C-alpha cells in the first residue's frame, strides 16, 4: 500500500479501455489520403462478399454475413440480422457496432432498413431493430 506522499509524487494510472468496434473510431481524409481520429456511431460501406458461416461449437446454423469495405477503407466482417435479406456484392450498407458471440471475428451488425438493405418481411414484434414498417390495420 503506497503512502499519500508516494501517490502525490506518482499518481495511479487509469487503465486504457480498448474499443470493441475499432473500425468505427477511424475516419479517412480522402483529399490528403490519411486516416483521422474521428469516432462515429455508424459507418457506411460497400459489401465485397456476402455468404454464410457456421458458428462455434455448441451451436449449429448457417449465419449470414457480409464482408464490407467501409468509407475509411477498412474491411470488416458484419452480421446480417433477421430472416432473409436482399444483400449482394456491391450493395451499400450501414454498419453499427455489436459482436456476434458465436461467430469469431464478427464485431459489427448491418442496420436493416437503411440504404440498400431492406427490412425484414412480415415482422410484427421488435420491428425497429429490423427496419420493418408498422403493418396496416
Curated annotation (Swiss-Prot):
Basic residues bias spans: 9-20
One Gene Ontology CC term in the entry: small ribosomal subunit
Sorted UniProt keywords: Methylation, Ribonucleoprotein, Ribosomal protein, RNA-binding, rRNA-binding, tRNA-binding
CDD domains: Ribosomal_S12 (cd03368)
Keyword presence, rRNA-binding: yes
Region feature (Disordered): 1-57
Entry keyword annotation includes Metal-binding: no
Biological process according to GO: translation
GO molecular-function terms, A-Z: rRNA binding; structural constituent of ribosome; tRNA binding
Oligomer and partners: Part of the 30S ribosomal subunit. Contacts proteins S8 and S17. May interact with IF1 in the 30S initiation complex.
NCBIfam families (alphabetical): rpsL_bact
Family matches, as PANTHER family: 30S RIBOSOMAL PROTEIN S12 FAMILY MEMBER
HAMAP family xref list: Ribosomal_uS12_B
Record-stated family: Belongs to the universal ribosomal protein uS12 family.
Protein name per Swiss-Prot or TrEMBL: Small ribosomal subunit protein uS12
Species of provenance: Streptococcus suis (strain 05ZYH33)
Name of the encoding gene: rpsL
Amino acid at each position: 500500500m503506497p503512502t499519500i506522499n508516494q501517490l502525490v509524487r506518482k499518481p495511479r494510472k487509469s487503465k486504457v479501455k480498448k474499443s470493441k468496434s475499432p473500425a468505427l473510431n477511424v475516419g479517412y481524409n480522402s483529399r490528403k489520403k490519411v486516416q483521422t481520429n474521428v469516432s462515429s456511431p455508424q459507418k457506411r460501406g460497400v459489401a465485397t462478399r456476402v455468404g454464410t458461416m457456421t458458428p462455434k461449437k455448441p451451436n449449429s446454423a448457417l449465419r449470414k454475413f457480409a464482408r464490407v469495405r467501409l468509407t475509411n477503407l477498412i474491411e470488416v466482417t458484419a452480421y446480417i440480422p433477421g430472416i432473409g435479406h436482399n444483400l449482394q456484392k456491391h450493395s451499400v450498407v450501414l454498419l453499427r457496432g455489436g459482436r456476434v458471440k458465436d461467430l469469431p471475428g464478427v464485431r459489427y451488425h448491418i442496420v436493416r432498413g437503411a440504404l440498400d438493405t431492406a427490412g425484414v418481411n412480415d415482422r410484427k414484434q421488435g420491428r425497429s431493430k429490423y427496419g420493418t414498417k408498422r403493418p396496416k390495420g
